[in-house]
Amino acid sequence: DLPDLELYLDQVLLYVNQVTQLSQATDHKLLTASMINNYVKHGYIDKPIKKKYQKKQVARLIAISILKNVFPIQDISQVLTSLQAASSSEVLYDTFVNYWNNGLTQSTPEIISYACQTVKDYQHTMKLSREMEDTKHEPNL
């Protein structure tokens, strides 16, 4: 669940990095203050109100953090904006997390299921690649 309180930047960083590290491969790059500032500057997330970020912005940052290794951020932002026209950020976040953790449900929009599966396939491919590299460097016994 997303925090009910509005968060300052340092709290957002801690929360988003904690949540996304649980679902990412070990080579996942942590979210930084500069990244958030750039996302705000480019309109990928709304500006904080009185330096505080709301649930909607935190949910969007989590989605961007998970999806950015596979999809261009501009595309992620465009799709999220389109999805938010039909559902609230909280409903979309819950749908995304539910699919990510449990797989397909009947109410999962196809675009969310394909995006999640693409990220999981990418992570699995990278894991296999690392394993291949590790076996190359093992001495023959």
Q: Model-derived features: where do they sit?
A:
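Basic helix-turn-helix/winged-helix DNA-binding cores
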Residues: D1-S82
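Intrinsically disordered, low-complexity, charge-dense segments enriched in Lys/Arg
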Residues: V79-L141
